[in-house]
Amino acid sequence: MINISDIPKNPGCYIYKNESGTVIYVGKAKNLKKRVSSYFNKKNHDPKTEKLVKSIYEMEFIVTDNEVEALILENTLIKKYSPKYNIDLKDSKNYAYIYISEENFPRIGISRNKSKKGKFYGPFTSAKERDYVLDVLKKTFKIRSCKNMHKRPCLRHHIKNCTAPCSGDITSKDYLNQIKKAEHILKGNIDSLIHELKNEMNEKSKNLQFEEALLIREEINAIERLKTRQNVKRDVKYNEDVISILEKSGKLHIMVFNVLKGTLFDRKYFEFDYTENFFEEFLIQYYSENDVPSEIIISELPKNLEEDNNEYSSDALLEYLSKKKGSKVAFKIPKQGEKKQLLDLAIKNLEIYVNGNEIKVQSLKNKLMLDKSPNIIECFDISHLSGTSTVGSVVQFRNGKPDKKNYRRFKIKTVSGIDDFKSISEVVFRRYSKLLEENLELPDLIIIDGGKGQLSSAFSELRKLKLKIPLISIAKREEEIYTPGIENPLPIKKNEKASLFIQEIRDEAHRFAINYNRLLRKKELIK
């Protein structure tokens, strides 16, 4: 179930998955909400896109700072997942880099091959964006692009787009200074370059060198138009993890951005109860199962890692991580630059993820007029094929997210043939009698997939167990929501946030039940 209202309007990448959780398509957008909405609101899709839309079961998104970052990240994700529909719809060849050669007077151009000597920046998934950046750099800094330097100036020199090192009109020192400026931009160090150029421009003006000051001003204007350069793809040789941490209501939320060879290629989310030594416990457990990077970027060191004289010093943790990696590992707390931008991006994604789920939970509390927030929600579904292999499922959502360790499947034992009412009665009774017997945590809200009949059956079982847990059901056809003792459905529109959240939970319970049903049928066939 795709809940459009949860999607931000930021630029970023969206990841579509099918019912089995396989990534089937990766896309990028300037406005995530607008782009994803177009898949489900537009009716006249081409056949391939229509087939894609029918296969979409769930979606993830990663927010970026701008559209160029989204372009680069899209390429990274496509290479990682090789999604079915991207392979069909996109050119699978490698994307090109902007290349600066290793010569006395380096040239600038485009290359897909990184084996030759030189410096490479990119890759660029958009040929239009790549060509624009290259064109600006060539014109702004008058860098040559010819493969072999001619003995006399070419047309680019005559239209003032090249300094013509071939003719000896510029010294090697001055030319390499222009190359250095271009490299500053391609590395993302735009602000520092603009600052240097402004100082240089002011100095020229003071010395009454107005023509040269004007040329520098033109350079600054061109550079500022390029200020949205990407910071997700960086031409570096090391790996790093970027870890953002958010504490909320006694819970710790952690998002890890994995950066491989300068490229953001994955993210992972974790949630657990707050403990005093959570950070080192998390790092030890996480890196016991994952590769240790050269750098771990974090917003701040926990207190017990800031001091060397406590029980658990930073030296011990770093020694453990370095030993596992086989080389030195460092914690970094960036205050500015690209790494700070990556950290800010990780924090932004984590806040959107956590707060988005909190908004869903609160909207449900308000619409159902519950006394407390439904932080733990369980949903039941029954699945069968013509009365055979009847199974039940219960899924649990905790703080707005699936909590799969608390999913349960039931073989129906007391019902013959098709009887959804009795089947619901059985699974509800079995589920909550066991929770009561083992003194385990009960949900704040129960959802039944079905109409008033299934709702009544579940309510009867809860009364037998003397449980007073808020209970609703959702009927498939019109997505109507019912509650015990009220004849008419609740006045909640099916496209409201609360209803969409209920539909999301119901769809997950349905998927889980169907998968179990298929498994049992397969076992029956091979007996």
From Swiss-Prot:
UniProt KW Cytoplasm keyword: yes
InterPro entries: GIY-YIG_endonuc (IPR000305), GIY-YIG_endonuc_sf (IPR035901), GIY-YIG_UvrC_Cho (IPR047296), UVR_dom (IPR001943), UVR_dom_sf (IPR036876), UvrABC_protein_C (IPR050066), UvrC (IPR004791), UvrC_RNase_H_dom (IPR001162)
GO cellular component, one term: excinuclease repair complex
SMART domains in the record: GIYc
UniProt xrefs under NCBIfam families: uvrC
Quaternary structure annotation from Swiss-Prot or TrEMBL: Interacts with UvrB in an incision complex.
This protein's name: UvrABC system protein C
